[in-house]
Amino acid sequence: MKEGIHPDYSEAVVKCACGETFTTGSTKKSLHVEICSKCHPFYTGRQKLVDTGGRVDKFKKKYGIVDNE
């Protein structure tokens, strides 16, 4: 690699809107994020499951598709 053309990569503090802080590597000194693994619904278990069955039924009804069950 050439000398002097790469940015300095150092430890950075990441601050979330929920108040959580952690460190990571970055070319910036600090980062601010809106959501992290401590407050994201997928990781906290508060995730809503979307039922796509209603969409499939609507499509079948719209195009007259009959199930052969």
From Swiss-Prot:
Cofactor binding, per record: Binds 1 zinc ion per subunit.
GO molecular function, a single term: structural constituent of ribosome
NCBIfam families referenced in this protein's UniProt entry, alphabetically: L31 (TIGR00105), PRK00019.1 (NF000612), PRK00528.1 (NF001809)
Similarity field: Belongs to the bacterial ribosomal protein bL31 family. Type A subfamily.
Cofactor(s) required for function per UniProt: Zn(2+)
Keywords: Metal-binding, Ribonucleoprotein, Ribosomal protein, RNA-binding, rRNA-binding, Zinc
Gene Ontology biological-process annotations: translation
The encoding gene: rpmE
InterPro entries, sorted: Ribosomal_bL28/bL31-like_sf, Ribosomal_bL31, Ribosomal_bL31_A, Ribosomal_bL31_sf
GO cellular component: ribonucleoprotein complex; ribosome
Function, in words: Binds the 23S rRNA.
Amino acids binding Zn(2+): 16, 18, 36, 39
Stated name of the protein: Large ribosomal subunit protein bL31
Originating species: Ruminiclostridium cellulolyticum (strain ATCC 35319 / DSM 5812 / JCM 6584 / H10) (Clostridium cellulolyticum)
Subunit structure: Part of the 50S ribosomal subunit.
